[in-house]
């Protein structure tokens, strides 16, 4: 059963964006792109997320997005994943909130994106920075919701959902012609 449009609006994710790197000034519409990509994620994806299935009774959920540079994301990657190098996107799911009252804001987690890596990958892949940013925001949000791509079937499910969400906002299939996982 599809929820009414007003219910969808009431359940929209709150998005907090911190622009930490001046490099993002090269893409002045970055905040709008992030918000649009997050808003494009359908509620069924949120409601059936592993470990977050009960969030549907809460009308307020939020995600924080850090728009940073390669140096910052390399530090985060080293600290939290033991990989001392830049990457395009990192997702940090919030731990499940115990005993949250209906109406209380539920933090889903944080997403960090590095401008230099994102811009380089966009050029290498022949896509726009805007489209690549949209893809990585959706990818990061799906990680916060419990989706992953370590196993082939998980990767296929996650990539299929990414394609559907991105198509809804006019972004071409980021996996067309690719064999590798993101």
Put a short name on every predicted segment.
Residues 1-133, 145-182:
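An acidic/histidine-cluster motif and surrounding catalytic segment
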Residues 138, 142-146:
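Short active-site segment of divalent metal-dependent hydrolases/proteases
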